[in-house]
Amino acid sequence: METVLSFSAIAVAIIVGLCAVGTAIGFAVLGGKFLEGAARQPEMAPMLQVKMFIIAGLLDAVPMIGIVIALLFTFANPFVGQLAG
């Protein structure tokens, strides 16, 4: 049982780490492309900003699902119940 808990802790750490790295890379690319587009066409900056915020919200949604799965493995691990019963 300790093996399942230790592997679950490692899996949670990997999930949280990859969520953080993936979100950081996504925001870096998104911000860079926004600044590039705004520098090329300054009159389009307000429209690009609205689209950037919409995409930023969608970009945050995927890691939040990963964090929910990590919390599930942390506090309500389904694999421990299989070992006990």
Curated annotation (Swiss-Prot):
One of its GO terms (cellular component) is proton-transporting ATP synthase complex. Keywords: ATP synthesis, Cell inner membrane, Cell membrane, CF(0), Hydrogen ion transport, Ion transport, Lipid-binding, Membrane, Transmembrane, Transmembrane helix, Transport. The chain crosses the membrane at residues 10-30, 53-73. One of its GO terms (molecular function) is proton-transporting ATP synthase activity, rotational mechanism. GO terms for biological process: proton motive force-driven ATP synthesis. It is a multi-pass membrane protein. SUPFAM superfamilies: F1F0 ATP synthase subunit C (SSF81333). Signal peptide: none annotated. Coiled coil: none annotated. The record marks D60 as: Reversibly protonated during proton transport. Pfam families: ATP-synt_C (PF00137). Its main location: membrane. It is found in: Cell inner membrane. F(1)F(0) ATP synthase produces ATP from ADP in the presence of a proton or sodium gradient. F-type ATPases consist of two structural domains, F(1) containing the extramembraneous catalytic core and F(0) containing the membrane proton channel, linked together by a central stalk and a peripheral stalk. During catalysis, ATP synthesis in the catalytic domain of F(1) is coupled via a rotary mechanism of the central stalk subunits to proton translocation. Belongs to the ATPase C chain family. F-type ATPases have 2 components, F(1) - the catalytic core - and F(0) - the membrane proton channel. F(1) has five subunits: alpha(3), beta(3), gamma(1), delta(1), epsilon(1). F(0) has three main subunits: a(1), b(2) and c(10-14). The alpha and beta chains form an alternating ring which encloses part of the gamma chain. F(1) is attached to F(0) by a central stalk formed by the gamma and epsilon chains, while a peripheral stalk is formed by the delta and b chains. This is ATP synthase subunit c.
